[in-house]
Amino acid sequence: MFQKEAEQPTVSSSAEDDELRALVESLRIKIAVIGCGGGGSNTVRRMYQAGVEGVKMVACNTDARHLLSIQAHHKILMGRSMTKGLGSGSLPEVGQKAAEESENDLWKYVDGQNIVFVVAGMGGGTGTGSAPVVAELAKRAGALTIGVVTLPFKAEGAVRMSNAIKGLEHLKEKCDTTIVLQNDRLLELVPKLPLEAAFRVTDEVLMQSIKGITDALTKPGLINIDFNDLLTIMRNGGMALIGLGESSEYGQRAEMCIEDALSSPMLGDVDIKQAKGALVRVIGGEDLTVTEAEKAALLVSERVDPRARIIWGCAVHGDIKNEMRVMVVLTGVKFNSIVDSFKNK
């Protein structure tokens, strides 16, 4: 005869759920996206309008008129006493001093965050000058600090290009990882667009790149990427590039997606064999298999440094039909390789 188990005290499901909700909330990764200057604020606006979830969005600028046009959870007019809300005059040193004047306001939005994305267009005054200040504050607060920046179109002039390279060199010293997108390389994807439309494409790619990383952490998937996974490749990850790919060729989607991503103009002329880490994020419709996603990660591992750390995840999106999409973030890329690729464009 089996001994009857002692009856357990009854606990209502609602009480259990409340406790679980409290635990889940305490474990929730806190993420902030801070847009610096006009370009960074535009990216924040696009993310806000797209309804990106689980992210605090903050826009910072020295131009009051532009800041008024931005949708965000929070806004900071930097350097009030210095610029009077009239902008930085395209001078990075003014952008830097404005951010330093507003450090107390900026601190409120980096303190307590697990991850801070510092977003800016390099080459102008406010973004170039303030982004390193924001990144330094985020690092001081203990956050994983990821810079996401663009390098200017050549049509924007030699001075802006020179400022961009100097600003990028300064920023990379303050961030754990700095992801770089070259506007002229992005233009190769849509070569016939007028300049204003090309800037919108840049905003969209920036937004999708950040969203790809945040979704991987905050939304459940077939294979999840957790915060510690991200720390593995992005804490002290150095310079990074992003490639995006997609394919609807069933049976070859993984191969074609990765080829698309790793041969993307977004990577420029950089030798990806030097990459020391990679994050591979795969999404698809209900026909997506874990085997396909694993294949994508394997293909990336074959193209980068054999000692590189690879993390990958995959998720099903109900609005995707017969298609597979991939985002590859390559970390540990040499700074000079990116600068040379930019100068040689």
Report the location of each language-model feature:
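Tubulin/FtsZ superfamily GTPase core signature
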Residues: M1-K345
